[in-house]
């Protein structure tokens, strides 16, 4: 088939993201309510803060805002992870970053599947945080063997989805009809299944080891456990959730409120208790807690220097608090966070000059008008000072460093945490994945460099 008959991976991803949102809205009605609240708040922010809308227009994010979301799944075996990577590749999504969640008391390690080029992200920024269960962290050998045997028996992909993945790999793409079929077949992998694959007793054994182990092992597939829309003001969302009948968690995760947001801020409501049917029970008499609602506000992608400062200030806040943030100490935690982060410049020019964040650069109309004039500035700073080049922070496309990932501990209930210490094993994760994960910092640096090259070309300069 001629390549020009193929649907672009970006388009398939956009279709899949829309279909996933529709499915999740039907499965978790509160998600629909959440989308309404996010839309209301985003419209308010853009009406009341024209500078925010202007920045989004410069970067092109204004067009992607309404469709922006991320999902999260957990798979049980290396084979499942490798195949999910092939499935996401059909949609132009690659593994970016390695996250060791064992240090947060969660027996998984993870990556984010997403598009990696700014043009593709502009079409669809959909991303899926994908975790692999670490069976080696189950300290009971009998329970570990039980989990392995249960996982070995399941098939989380439809045969047609596997056929279409292989066809795409073989032929280099999918046509419109096959792409539509692929989206529907791929959705089956992410659906919620009320029928468990274990008995009530087996479920309890897995659950007693860790709730998340039961969530991964006891069901037919890696149901999407949350789908997260992007807001422009997470504090307004946090305040507005109760009026919509959505109880928010005590603390917004990540950095404090800022004029210029950095990295990622997240809040959520606790997981839903859902009825399930265990193998040895008639009807749906059991229950399981897994899926929750989450909202995020994305800010500037930080450089290694910026990340180091972020981690330092966050650690200082945790030490001063003397424990993990919770409902009882939420007010004190937020006050400490705000005070400590006063050290992090809340000004884009200062962040740029100090090398704390990545930026995108744009040739202005003034710059284009002067592109052939003699004596015009030729250095980047000179061009910025003269108004020939405009800059905006590159949006953070990834996830919170685990040091801030309290979402993972809090949304399943306060007793969901176990002690695993830090057991990072990127090599084992990549072996299971069958691919190397990409370095997110290198991707931001490349994106920044491409924008500088585009500016230089537009302004008739050799380089900047």
From Swiss-Prot:
Instruction: Note the site residues: Important for substrate specificity.
Output: 74
Q: In which pathway does it act?
A: Amino-acid degradation
How's its activity regulated?
Inhibited by EDTA.
Q: What is its EC number?
A: 1.13.11.93
What reaction is this protein's catalytic activity?
2-oxoadipate + O2 = (R)-2-hydroxyglutarate + CO2
Molecular function terms, GO-annotated: dioxygenase activity
Keywords per UniProt: Dioxygenase, Iron, Oxidoreductase
Listed binding positions for Fe(2+) are 70, 226, 294
InterPro entries referenced in this protein's UniProt entry, alphabetically: HGLS, YdcJ_bac-like
In this chain, 2-oxoadipate is annotated as bound at: 70, 74, 226, 402
Induction cue: Up-regulated when grown on L-lysine, D-lysine or 2-aminoadipate.
Disruption outcome: Deletion mutant is unable to grow on either isomer of lysine.
Which coenzymes or cofactors are required? Fe(2+)
Entry's family note: Belongs to the 2-oxoadipate dioxygenase/decarboxylase family.
Under the heading PANTHER family, the entry gives: 2-OXOADIPATE DIOXYGENASE_DECARBOXYLASE (PTHR39479:SF2), PTHR39479
| Function according to Swiss-Prot or TrEMBL | Catalyzes the decarboxylation and hydroxylation of 2-oxoadipate (2OA) to form D-2-hydroxyglutarate (D-2-HGA). Is specific for 2-oxoadipate. Is involved in a D-lysine catabolic pathway.
The protein here is known as 2-oxoadipate dioxygenase/decarboxylase
- According to its UniProt entry, this protein's organism is Pseudomonas putida (strain ATCC 47054 / DSM 6125 / CFBP 8728 / NCIMB 11950 / KT2440)
């Amino acid at each position: 088939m001629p390549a020009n008959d193929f649907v672009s991976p970006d388009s398939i991803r956009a279709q899949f993201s829309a279909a996933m949102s529709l499915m999740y809205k039907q499965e978790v009605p509160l998600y629909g309510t959440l989308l309404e609240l996010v839309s209301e708040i985003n419209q308010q922010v853009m009406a009341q803060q024209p500078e925010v809308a202007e920045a989004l227009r410069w970067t092109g994010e204004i067009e992607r805002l309404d469709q922006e979301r991320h999902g999260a799944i957990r798979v049980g075996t290396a084979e499942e992870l490798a195949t999910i990577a092939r499935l996401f590749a059909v949609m132009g999504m690659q593994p970016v970053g390695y996250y060791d969640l064992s240090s947060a008391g969660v027996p998984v390690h993870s990556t984010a599947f997403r598009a990696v080029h700014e043009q593709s992200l502009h079409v669809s920024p959909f991303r899926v945080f994908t975790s692999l269960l670490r069976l080696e962290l189950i300290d009971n050998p009998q329970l570990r063997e039980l989990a392995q045997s249960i996982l070995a028996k399941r098939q989380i992909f439809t045969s047609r989805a596997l056929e279409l993945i292989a066809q795409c790999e073989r032929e280099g793409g999918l046509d419109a009809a096959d792409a539509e079929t692929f989206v529907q077949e791929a959705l089956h992998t992410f659906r919620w299944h009320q029928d468990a694959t274990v008995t009530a007793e087996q479920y309890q054994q897995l659950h007693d080891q860790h709730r998340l182990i039961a969530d991964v092992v006891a069901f037919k597939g890696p149901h999407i456990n949350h789908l997260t829309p992007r807001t422009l003001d997470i504090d307004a969302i946090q305040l507005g959730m109760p009026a919509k009948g959505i109880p928010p968690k005590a603390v917004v995760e990540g950095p404090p409120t800022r004029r210029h947001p950095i990295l990622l801020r997240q809040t959520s409501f606790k997981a839903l208790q859902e009825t399930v049917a265990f193998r040895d029970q008639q009807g749906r008499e059991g229950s399981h807690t897994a899926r929750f609602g989450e909202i995020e506000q994305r800010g500037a992608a930080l450089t290694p220097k910026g990340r180091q400062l972020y981690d330092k200030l966050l650690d200082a806040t945790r030490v001063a608090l003397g424990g993990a943030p919770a409902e009882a100490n939420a007010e004190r935690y937020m006050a400490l966070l705000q005070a400590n982060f006063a050290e992090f410049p809340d000004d884009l020019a200062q962040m740029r000059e100090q090398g704390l964040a990545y930026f995108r650069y744009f040739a202005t109309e003034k710059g284009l008008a002067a592109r052939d004039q003699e004596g015009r500035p030729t250095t980047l700073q000179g061009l910025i000072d003269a108004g020939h080049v405009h800059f905006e922070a590159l949006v953070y496309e990834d996830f919170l460093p685990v040091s801030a990932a309290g979402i993972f501990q809090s949304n399943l209930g306060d007793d969901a945490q176990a002690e695993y210490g830090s057991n990072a094993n990127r090599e084992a994760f990549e072996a299971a994945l069958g691919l190397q994960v990409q370095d997110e910092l290198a991707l931001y640096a490349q994106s920044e460099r491409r924008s500088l090259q585009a500016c230089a070309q537009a302004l008739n300069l050799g380089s900047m």
